Amino acid sequence: MLLKKAAERDWKPAGPEGVERSLFRNNDTGGRSSVVRLKQGARVPRHAHHGNEEVVVLEGIVTIGGVEMREGDYLYTEAGEEHDVVGVTDAVIFVSSQKATPAVE
């Protein structure tokens, strides 16, 4: 069993300015589960994953691949599906990917 308390999250910069990640775990196939925090206007460039990815919006509004998502919305992407992520407002999302993420843009 692995437990990560919200109060104990360790936020680290995650590439683009205004994007931070709190890692829950890395898996054996190179994927990971984490919470990502985006400032309004922050953008994760277009990319794809070698495996499937699941996203749940916990707070705020984001667009992923041009689709607007709000608190409670869920998105599943297949391996190889390209998308970017933009913080329409300050936002927090849960992201779980099966495999590593190669950059596209």
Segments and roles (model prediction):
Residues 31-35, 55, 91-92:
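Structural motif
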